[in-house]
């Protein structure tokens, strides 16, 4: 609550369990934090809008263009991509799961400034049938994640998740080839039993066998199991001494939600 208020979310309220149940009768809780301005976005539509905006300002998006190396020479970055050299004054490493592998290919970036990366798969379970809630419901966070919370997409489909499933980190050789296709995004049906138990801590009336496997994602994390949570790492010239370089590492959820604020922070650096 205090963190949210200090970050500018000025409509947060702490309410009793009875007040929460007046808003959401199916909810079981003793105390709640009410955030009336919380909502959802269409992730794909947002990305398409950002792409269109970037292209309208002259950006060129080059997909399937593997980055080999970068070196700062003569006041410009020289990036080798698909056997060709691209030069620029600014280089932003925003490669998500591959951000550490990209950082290791930047000449002059000291190894001790490149953190170890951990990976946590987040599985979601899909609700079959009607959802009694009209708001997003978040339980108290758990180590490694936000807890099994309720999300409702723009089509009205309710899902629960993500859980935290730590997956083995790729070897340096695997990371060097890129992580596309490295992880499995299948949701194991055996995890549904745990989902049901977690959801029933705040929705006691969840019907039996009402959940089905949903979707999954993999989060790049700067800390591993049983370690305190870490914030995003935004690393600029003040940290590494390389002009025009910004590294964005550990950009896990809610990175998409905060993408415009992250972009503003990067803009202030460069």
Model-inferred region functions:
Residues 1-23, 29, 147-148:
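Dinucleotide-binding Rossmann-like beta1-alpha1 core, especially the glycine-rich loop
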Residues 12-15, 60-62, 212:
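General small-molecule cofactor/ligand-binding pocket signal
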Residues 22-30, 71-78, 86, 223-229, ...:
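A short, glycine/Asx- and small/polar-enriched loop/turn
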Residues 26, 208-249, 253, 257:
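FAD-binding beta-loop-beta segment adjacent to the flavin cofactor pocket
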Residues 34-90, 101, 260:
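Helical element adjacent to the flavin cofactor pocket in flavoenzyme catalytic cores
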Residues 84-134, 185-189, 267:
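Central helical "cap/lid" subdomain
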Residues 110-119, 128-227:
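Active-site lid/adjacent beta-loop-alpha segment flanking the redox-cofactor pocket in flavoenzymes
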Residues 259-270:
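Internal hydrophobic alpha-helix adjacent to the cofactor/substrate pocket in enzyme cavities
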């Amino acid at each position: 609550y205090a963190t949210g208020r200090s970050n500018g979310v000025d409509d947060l309220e702490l309410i009793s369990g009875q007040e929460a149940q007046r808003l959401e009768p199916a909810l079981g809780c003793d105390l709640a934090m009410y955030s009336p301005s919380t909502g959802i976005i269409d992730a794909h539509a947002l990305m398409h809008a950002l792409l269109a905006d970037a292209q309208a300002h002259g950006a060129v998006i080059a997909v399937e263009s593997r980055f080999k190396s970068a070196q700062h020479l003569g006041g410009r970055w020289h990036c080798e991509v698909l056997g060709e050299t691209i030069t620029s004054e600014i280089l932003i490493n925003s490669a998500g799961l591959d951000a550490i592998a990209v950082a290791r290919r930047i000449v002059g970036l000291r190894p001790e400034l490149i953190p170890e990366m951990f990976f946590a798969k987040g599985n979601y379970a899909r609700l079959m049938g009607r959802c009694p809630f009209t708001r997003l419901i978040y339980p108290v966070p758990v180590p490694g994640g936000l807890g099994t919370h309720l999300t409702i997409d723009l089509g009205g489909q309710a899902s629960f998740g993500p859980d935290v499933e730590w997956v083995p980190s790729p070897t340096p050789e695997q990371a060097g080839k890129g992580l596309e296709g490295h992880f499995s995004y299948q949701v194991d049906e055996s995890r549904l039993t745990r989902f049901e138990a977690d959801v029933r801590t705040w929705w006691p009336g969840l019907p039996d066998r009402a959940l089905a496997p949903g979707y999954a994602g993999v989060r790049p994390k700067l800390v591993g199991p049983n370690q305190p949570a870490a914030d995003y790492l935004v690393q600029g010239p003040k940290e590494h001494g390389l002009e025009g370089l910004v590294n964005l590492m550990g950009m896990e959820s809610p990175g998409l939600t905060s993408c415009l604020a992250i972009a503003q922070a990067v803009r202030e650096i460069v």
